[in-house]
UniProtKB/Swiss-Prot annotation:
CDD domains: FtsZ_type1. Gene3D superfamilies: Tubulin/FtsZ, C-terminal domain (3.30.1330.20), Tubulin/FtsZ, GTPase domain (3.40.50.1440). Essential cell division protein that forms a contractile ring structure (Z ring) at the future cell division site. The regulation of the ring assembly controls the timing and the location of cell division. One of the functions of the FtsZ ring is to recruit other cell division proteins to the septum to produce a new cell wall between the dividing cells. Binds GTP and shows GTPase activity. Coiled coil: none annotated. GO terms for cellular component: cell division site; cytoplasm. SMART domains: Tubulin, Tubulin_C. PROSITE patterns: FTSZ_1 (PS01134), FTSZ_2 (PS01135). Keywords: Cell cycle, Cell division, Cytoplasm, GTP-binding, Nucleotide-binding, Septation. Belongs to the FtsZ family. This is Cell division protein FtsZ. GTP binds at G21, G22, G23, G24, N25, G107, T108, G109, E138, R142, N186. Homodimer. Polymerizes to form a dynamic ring structure in a strictly GTP-dependent manner. Interacts directly with several other division proteins. GO terms for molecular function: GTP binding; GTPase activity.
């Protein structure tokens, strides 16, 4: 069954804060690609901030570092952010949702990002972190610092999406330049922020608004964001599969996932059958008890293609890494059979009039849900 909820359209204020050098670079990259959100770069390094093209900048810990960086010391980054908690609070004032992005493993981002998150949560803001883990060539010491920083950050956010840079090497190949590798990392961070923020800010025929995002991301822990695009006769299924594959994001286990937001973008030719087909793919990999919220956006420029954005929250890390070489055909047959024999997860649909402007943010409540056995999460080749 679908729940139909009429809603008015209003603004939800979204702020994206890049902490440290990696976070600042990512935000600078994003501000050229993502609209309808406010961007901020926060750093101890005054020289790095002076070169930033981000409109809003904040230098922290000037009494501590004298305008220099944190020297790859997370403790310095933490103390610098703590020194300027009041300024950070002022920066976050008025936000409904905050994305915190950082390259973990260094000093300012690793130590400062958890402080920013803590302040945001204390202010009652929906707080989501999107961070990278170091490349293997950056060494075990940096990786250890990153892991410790991520553990600390996780304590203070509603949801966290982690991007291991090592995955980029397998996708890009060893012949890729260093610049290409870091640009690719920025692309992944940007797509994660864009994928979630556009769910809120871009009006749709069937609308996903801030209240939906809040219900699925509040106090949910580990999250995954995936985007897939396909064209042709099987575009709905193929785009949905690509979205949940997410080869660049952290290996995760969808068993017991508590919430899913699905956004489907296509042209005027999108059918209700395609809408349901995307739902089949998504529901076949999650618990019957998970909250599934779906929305659509009609883009007249997409004549033959379809894009599916999926945000999955309340998931668990995989103890051992899974390969991507799973045969997809057999998994689809199993999924189709499984789906036809079980009750669909709650599939909540928001219907709104298509207008320009941001989406509505009425309050909705979501109950805690229990984990249950479901088909294993299968990766595409």
């Amino acid at each position: 069954m679908f729940d139909f909820n009429d809603s008015m359209v209003s603004n939800a204020i979204i702020k994206v804060v890049g902490v440290g050098g990696g976070g600042g670079n990512a935000v600078q990259h994003m501000c050229e690609e993502v609209s309808d959100v406010e961007f901020f770069a926060l750093n101890t390094d005054g020289q790095a901030l002076s070169k930033s093209k981000v409109q809003n900048i904040l230098q922290i810990g000037t009494n501590l570092t004298k305008g220099l960086g944190a020297g790859a010391n997370p403790e310095i980054g933490k103390r610098a952010a703590t020194e300027d908690r009041a300024k950070i609070e002022q920066l976050l004032e008025g936000a409904d949702m905050v994305f915190i992005t950082a390259g973990m493993g260094g000093g300012t981002g690793t130590g400062g990002a958890p402080v920013v998150a803590e302040v945001a949560k204390e202010m009652g803001i929906l707080t989501v972190a999107v961070v990278t883990k170091p490349f293997p060539f950056e060494g075990p010491r940096r990786m250890k610092a990153a892991e410790q920083g991520i553990d600390e950050l996780t304590k203070h956010v509603d949801s966290i999406i982690t991007v291991p840079n090592e995955k980029l090497l397998s996708v890009l190949g060893k012949g890729a330049s260093l610049i290409d590798a870091f640009n690719a990392a920025n692309d992944v961070l940007g797509n994660a922020v864009k994928g979630v923020s556009e769910l809120i800010t871009k009006p749709g025929l069937i609308n996903v608004d801030f209240a939906d995002v809040r219900a699925v991301m509040t106090n949910m822990g580990l999250a995954m964001m995936g985007m897939g695009e396909a064209s042709g006769e099987n575009r709905a299924r193929e785009a949905a599969e690509a979205a949940i594959s997410s080869p660049l994001l952290e290996d995760i286990n969808l068993d017991g996932a508590k919430g899913v937001i699905v956004n489907i973008t296509a042209g005027m030719d999108m059918s209700i059958g395609e809408f349901e087909e995307v739902g089949e793919v998504i529901r076949s990999f999650i618990s019957d008890e998970a909250i599934v919220i779906a929305g659509t956006v009609i883009d007249p420029d997409m004549s033959d293609s379809m894009k599916v954005t999926v945000v999955v929250t309340g998931i668990e890390k995989v103890a051992m890494k899974r390969g991507f070489g799973v045969e997809k055909t057999s998994s689809l047959q199993q999924s189709a059979s499984s789906f036809s024999n079980k009750t669909s997860a709650p599939f909540l649909r928001k219907e709104t009039e298509v207008v320009t402007g941001a989406s509505n943010a009425p309050k909705t409540d979501s109950d805690d849900v229990n984990k249950s056995d479901i088909p294993s999460f299968l990766r595409r080749r």
